[in-house]
Design a protein with these regions (language model features):
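N-terminal module-boundary/linker segments of secreted carbohydrate-active enzymes
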Residues: 13-73, 79, 88-89
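Substrate-binding cleft of extracellular glycoside hydrolase catalytic domains
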Residues: 79-195
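Bacterial Sec-dependent signal peptides at the C-terminal "C-region" and cleavage site
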Residues: 4-16
Length: 196
């Protein structure tokens, strides 16, 4: 009986779907899995970039001002990755620095990608059908790959002082079940979205 009780406290290892996941990514997955059933992790978009009545103040966060601590989860956006600043007006160089700072505090970083419409050049909310043109053989495939190369370069630069990569939760096409984005459920077929 004691043995059975003892084994119930052993936490099973979660195996990532990516066989090439880094040790840091596996550790983040374990950390998230360990949180299940224990409570909620509070997150805040652009938490340390700007807030109510302030912008670019070192170590500042509205959540810290109000609650006394930083959020557990920090959200950032890669929209306008081909520019100096993202869609929220935060410089990408600052985002990298703030991701490193959040990671050093034990925070979890997430990255969404509100990429501009690849054909019209308008924002992500232009829901003109385009996904089929981004896939291999499509007219916009090469241009889309160039954008993804910018995303990859950004991610490759997210390293800790010891040179290890900072794990992030990448949410490239979030809210895909909605109608508003060009990648949304009414703007492409399921197989196109999966291929994307």
């Amino acid at each position: 009986m004691v043995w059975l009780i003892g084994i119930s406290f052993v936490q099973s290892e979660v195996v990532p779907s990516d066989p090439y996941a880094t040790r840091e990514t596996k550790a983040l997955l374990q950390r998230l899995h360990a949180q299940v059933g224990r409570g909620v992790l509070i997150g805040h978009q652009d938490a340390t970039a700007y807030g109510v009545g302030w912008k670019s103040e070192s170590s500042r966060s509205d959540m810290k001002d109000v609650c006394g601590d930083y959020p557990a989860v920090y959200g950032w956006d890669l929209g306008d990755i081909d520019q100096d600043r993202n869609i929220d007006g935060v410089a990408f160089a600052d985002i990298k620095r703030l991701i490193r700072e959040a990671d050093a505090r034990g925070g979890i970083n997430t990255l969404s990608m509100h990429l501009d419409h690849p054909v019209s050049g308008r924002n992500a909310w232009d829901n003109t059908k385009v996904v089929h043109q981004l896939l291999p053989g499509g007219a916009e495939h090469e241009g889309f790959l160039a954008t993804l190369d910018l995303v990859a370069a950004f991610l490759a630069d997210l390293k800790r002082d010891d040179g290890t990569f900072i794990p992030v939760v990448l949410r490239p096409y979030h809210e895909h079940s909605e109608r508003w984005p060009w990648w949304g459920r009414t703007n492409c077929y399921e197989d196109e979205f999966i291929a994307l």
